[in-house]
Amino acid sequence: SLTAKSKSIVKAFWGKIGSRADDIGAEAFGRMLTVYPETKTYFASWSDLSPGSAAVKKHGKTIMGGIAEAVGHIDDLTGGLASLSELHAFKLRVDPANFKILAHNLIVVLALFFPADFTPEVHMAVDKFFQNVASALSEKYR
């Protein structure tokens, strides 16, 4: 679980993301689809899965909205993300291993967008947070 200090670091860092959230989401999602092409199977109905496409940008924004929701529920991720977990488990049927793949890509992009702010301490707190988010999203699979 996250320590009080890690929660504080995540909240403070997330506060810096602000207007860049949509770009971060689009870049991370596009990167995931490129680096891990097997993840494209969940989006087979989309006509354009290339980085920067309208669909990728739109879903990147959706992802970042979910992460912002998680930051808001940082003290109860399982409860706060229950509906997202249910959606991904029962309707979308996403393999929960993909949450960790997306988390990795988000970390890479956050480091690229905020090189001065993404210190080892921030990296550690954000990584733990994303692992907790992945676990909470996997809850309905159990």
Swiss-Prot record:
Tell me the name of the encoding gene.
Answer: hba
Please report which protein family the annotation says this sequence is part of. Belongs to the globin family.
What Gene Ontology cellular component terms go with this record?
A: blood microparticle; haptoglobin-hemoglobin complex; hemoglobin complex
Pfam families, per the entry: Globin (PF00042)
Annotated CDD domains: Hb-alpha-like
- Tissue specificity field: Red blood cells.
What is its biological role? Involved in oxygen transport from gills to the various peripheral tissues.
Ranges for domain Globin come to: 1-142
Keywords assigned by UniProt, alphabetized: Acetylation, Heme, Iron, Metal-binding, Oxygen transport, Transport
List the Gene Ontology MF annotations in alphabetical order. haptoglobin binding; heme binding; iron ion binding; organic acid binding; oxygen binding; oxygen carrier activity; peroxidase activity
Provide one Gene Ontology biological process annotation: hydrogen peroxide catabolic process
UniProt-recorded name of the protein: Hemoglobin subunit alpha
* Keyword Protein biosynthesis appears in the UniProt entry: no
What residues bear N-acetylserine in this entry?
1
- The residues listed in the UniProt record as binding O2, with positions renumbered to this chain, are 59
Subunit-level organization: Heterotetramer of two alpha chains and two beta chains.
InterPro entries attached to this UniProt entry: Globin, Globin-like_sf, Globin/Proto, Hemoglobin_a-typ, Hemoglobin_oxygen_transport, Hemoglobin_pi
Q: Which residues bind heme b?
A: 88
